[in-house]
Amino acid sequence: VENHVKNHLKNVAATLRALYEDEDYSLILIGGNSNYALVVADLIKEIVTNISIDVLAELGITDQPHAVAEAVTSYALKSFVVESSKMVEEIITEYEKGGLAVAGLRGVIYASNLYAVHQLIIDEYEPIAGKQCQSCGALGIDEVECPLCHGEMGEIEDLIDLLICKTLRDDGDVFVIGGQSPLREYDGIGASLRFAV
């Protein structure tokens, strides 16, 4: 029986590898009996070496799609909280030591206007009125004259939305945490940079 189970688990691992080769996954989550799930995780780690593998112990054994969806959603939310907290701390630390990060609305706008934003982090999305150059599109808070081309700045209703759009258009990443974070001390916004500004 033990050999049969082991062969079955190897087949499961091989199937997962085939799926991984067909698609670009960043994480494999394994549910089921926790003892077998750990064995499957070890087998998969031998086959798929460059992808994260985790066991969803709370899932248990189920064939109910809603139970799987709930467990995966819960895992994703917990992971997002951990990752976003880590990103916020890294940005604040890098900013405070004068590295490749900015914090605060003015700093982020300045970096965005120079196409330097790599990852934009917003703790809680709230529309903020601002300015945009009518000539070159540069963003601002209260400037009368464009900081880049010295053109006329016009009023805009949602500066944060334009920062998000501009970051994505410039091949950056955007993370909206959806709650208060240590970035609140810096207008609730920060960014890691591609280059120093």
Where are the regions a protein language model picked out?
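Terminal alpha-helical anchor/extension segments at protein ends
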Residues: 1-197
